């Protein structure tokens, strides 16, 4: 009788482990398209991601690079001062989007051009997204001031 209870308990524990592992795998599989990794322009230039990968890029909009094309198409270059990546975006830019200002874009790298599906701009004079701050610090060009909130 004791051996049967022990065997049954082991079976239940094994079944619970398999169910937990299966549900974790299903959740991970379902979330794979919702995860966008952040890259700096230097990282994109050094190791370009595959064209099918959606990721986020952030940095400063290079001064003098903003060109408004036909309709809602806009091209510009994003830089972290070490590398520059051309960006193409079709849509309405945020009101605070400007040259020499911080931005984060979501999209794909196609033929060396980042085709953005979404563009976000910093929301005031002192804010900069945490990922952009980290990338600029890594390049040694970010200078933090006391009144500059991050992230």
UniProtKB/Swiss-Prot annotation:
Transmembrane segments in this chain: where?
10-30
- Give GO BP annotations, semicolon-separated: cytochrome complex assembly
Membrane topology label: Single-pass type II membrane protein
Q: Choose one Gene Ontology CC annotation of this protein and give it.
A: plasma membrane
Please indicate the ranges of residues that lie on the Periplasmic side. Answer: 31-151
**InterPro entries per UniProt:** CcmE, CcmE-like_sf, NA-bd_OB-fold
What family, per the record? Answer: Belongs to the CcmE/CycJ family.
Q: What name does this protein carry?
A: Cytochrome c-type biogenesis protein CcmE
Question: Which organism was this protein described from?
Answer: Cereibacter sphaeroides (strain ATCC 17023 / DSM 158 / JCM 6121 / CCUG 31486 / LMG 2827 / NBRC 12203 / NCIMB 8253 / ATH 2.4.1.) (Rhodobacter sphaeroides)
**Lineage, broadest ranks:** Bacteria, Pseudomonadati, Pseudomonadota, Alphaproteobacteria, Rhodobacterales
**GN (gene name):** ccmE
């Amino acid at each position: 009788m004791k051996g049967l209870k022990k065997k049954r308990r082991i079976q239940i524990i094994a079944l619970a482990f398999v169910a937990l592992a299966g549900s974790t795998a299903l959740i991970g599989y379902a979330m794979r398209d919702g995860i966008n990794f952040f890259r700096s322009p230097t990282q994109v230039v050094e190791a370009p991601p595959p064209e099918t990968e959606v990721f986020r890029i952030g940095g400063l909009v290079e001064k003098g690079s903003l060109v408004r094309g036909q309709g809602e198409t806009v091209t510009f270059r994003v830089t972290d001062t070490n590398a520059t990546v051309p960006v193409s975006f079709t849509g309405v830019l945020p009101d605070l989007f400007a040259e020499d200002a911080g931005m984060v874009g979501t999209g794909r790298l196609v033929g060396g051009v980042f085709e953005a599906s979404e563009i976000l701009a910093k929301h005031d004079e002192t804010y900069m997204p945490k990922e952009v701050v980290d990338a600029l610090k890594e390049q040694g060009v970010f200078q933090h001031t006391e009144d500059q909130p991050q992230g």
